[in-house]
Design a protein with these regions (language model features):
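Glycine-rich phosphate-binding loop of ATP-grasp-fold ATP-dependent ligases
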Residues: 1-5, 63-66
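Residue-level preference for beta-strand/loop junctions
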Residues: 26-28, 46-48, 137
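A short beta-strand motif that forms the metal-chelation/ATP-contact edge
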Residues: 42-58
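Peripheral (often C-terminal) accessory segments that flank ATP-dependent C-N-forming ligase machineries
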Residues: 78-164
Length: 164
């Protein structure tokens, strides 16, 4: 599982902006991966934001689509506008938590795909087979859905992943 938050934390935004500045990034579609320390370590204190990856390219897999769903926008149009015109006027719309859950073949799930798609009909954005090349990391069947609250998203994860 992974998800796009409905609003990034201020310290994560700050870390991203400082990373852009440090790498002198202009007019690029980039993605950075940060994590928050859950205890004091050599890298920093509990709660600190630490960079895991700095990528000068869009994120892979289905995450650009999830960014679109989470922000009611089109990140590819924004990128094209920036490349063509130096800026984009496209605004984000309503914000959501966008959840990805992957199921593995051969597991005995409590709820069928039909059960999940009916229960979460208003939230589901995509249900599809994951390409074999990605299935080792992401599962064989993916569910992508939007939620207004983290609690709703957590309930979705619980239902999608529950086994007998």
């Amino acid at each position: 599982v992974f998800y796009i938050v409905n609003e990034p934390f201020a310290d994560v935004k700050d870390a991203g902006r400082r990373t852009l500045k440090a790498f002198k990034v202009k007019n690029r579609f980039v993605h950075f991966e940060f994590f928050r320390l859950t205890k004091d370590q050599r890298l920093g204190k509990k709660g600190d934001i630490v960079a895991l990856e700095v990528n000068m390219r869009p994120s892979g897999g289905f995450s650009p689509d999830m960014m679109n769903y989470a922000n009611s926008t089109n990140v590819f149009k924004i990128w094209a506008d920036v490349m063509a015109f130096g800026h984009s006027d496209l605004k984000c719309g309503e914000k959501y938590f966008c959840a990805f859950a992957g199921r593995r073949d051969g597991k005995n799930f409590i709820y069928s795909e039909k059960d999940i798609t009916e229960r979460y009909a208003g939230s589901i954005k995509t249900v599809a087979r994951v390409p074999d090349v990605l299935s080792g990391a992401m599962g064989n069947v993916m569910y992508i859905a939007n939620f207004r609250t983290k609690a709703e998203m957590d309930g979705f994860y619980k239902d999608v992943l529950a086994t007998k």
